[in-house]
Structure formats: structure tokens, C-alpha cells
């Protein structure tokens, strides 16, 4: 057979890089934390915007994030991965971010969604690239969820995210916070 050998997770790792198991556990941990945070952001937004014109859009995105969280809950349990120790922080911070941006207005809530989902799109793409055929289930899950996150980002843009007061500052801060949360939740 002259066919190319299927890619395996962490096959090209260098000395000092995480082992395959550590890499995959970190991915599951951070993705579980991220989906938990996303659910909390939408809960915060809904607490403020319930009954308004943005409610149906936010509720639909929240339901998809809940499905993502359920998927990572299953993996955390099946693979016996330790969840992040920062869950209490993400519980409060996610709700506060959602409610805080919603208090500015529906466009700011959409700007928050756009910023978070843009970072998650990049994050999930990088993860999928690292996963080989031996982690096809996880890779497929991440790619499926990534499509939803991109759709959320695009919907937030359609709903006027760029019209939010202080759009550049707001989205820059949310992106920086999202990247920090990813870095911390992978490790802690």
C-alpha cells in the first residue's frame, strides 16, 4: 500500500510538548469551560433582554450552547477529565458579561457574541487541526460546534453588533478576556 498513513493526535510533538493524553484532556477541559461560560453569557443577556426583540435570537443561540455543553459534559464524564477549577469564576463572570453588555443594549449584547464567537472559531479550528484520526469523534464534535459558533458570530453581525456603542473597545476587551479564559481553563 502506498497510501498516506492517517494522522495521529500529537504525532509531531516536540520534547517538552504535552503528551497526547494531556493535550486531549486540556482540550476537553477548556471546551467544557467555554461552553459553560457561553451558556452563562446568554443567561445573563436573557435576564436583561427577556421580552424584547432580541430574546428569540439569544434564546436560540443559548439552546445550541446548552447542547454543546451537554456534549462536553458527556466527554468529561466518559473520559474522566478533571473540569477546570475556575468554574465558579466562569459562572459569575459569564453571567456578568452577558448581563453587562445587555444593559448597554441589544447591539452591545450582539457585539459580545460576535467577539466571543470569533475567538472560539479560531480556537476550535486550531484544535481540530491538532487532532488526528485517533480522535475523530472529538474532532468531528469540535468541527460541528465550530459551525454553530460561526453561525452565531454571523447572526450577531446581522443583528447590528457593529452599531454597539464603543464597538471596537468592547469587542477588543471581550476578545482579550476570552483568550485569557481559554489559556487559564486549559491549565487550571
Give the ranges of each region predicted by the language model:
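Non-heme di-metal
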Residues: 1-188
Amino acid at each position: 500500500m502506498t497510501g498516506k498513513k492517517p494522522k495521529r493526535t500529537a504525532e509531531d510533538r516536540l520534547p517538552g510538548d504535552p503528551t497526547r493524553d494531556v493535550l486531549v484532556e486540556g482540550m476537553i477541559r477548556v471546551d467544557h469551560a467555554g461552553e459553560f461560560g457561553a451558556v452563562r453569557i446568554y443567561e445573563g443577556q436573557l435576564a436583561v433582554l427577556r421580552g424584547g426583540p432580541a430574546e428569540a435570537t439569544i434564546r436560540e443561540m443559548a439552546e445550541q450552547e446548552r447542547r454543546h455543553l451537554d456534549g462536553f459534559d458527556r466527554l468529561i464524564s466518559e473520559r474522566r477529565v478533571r473540569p477546570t477549577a475556575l468554574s465558579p469564576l466562569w459562572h459569575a463572570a459569564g453571567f456578568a458579561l452577558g448581563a453587562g453588555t445587555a444593559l448597554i443594549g441589544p447591539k452591545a449584547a450582539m457585539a459580545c457574541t460576535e467577539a466571543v464567537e470569533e475567538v472560539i472559531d479560531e480556537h476550535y479550528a486550531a484544535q481540530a487541526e491538532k487532532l488526528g484520526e485517533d480522535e475523530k469523534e472529538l474532532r468531528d464534535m469540535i468541527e460541528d460546534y465550530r459551525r454553530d459558533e460561526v453561525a452565531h458570530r454571523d447572526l450577531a453581525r446581522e443583528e447590528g453588533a457593529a452599531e454597539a456603542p464603543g464597538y471596537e473597545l468592547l469587542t477588543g476587551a471581550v476578545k482579550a478576556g476570552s483568550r485569557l479564559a481559554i489559556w487559564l481553563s486549559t491549565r487550571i
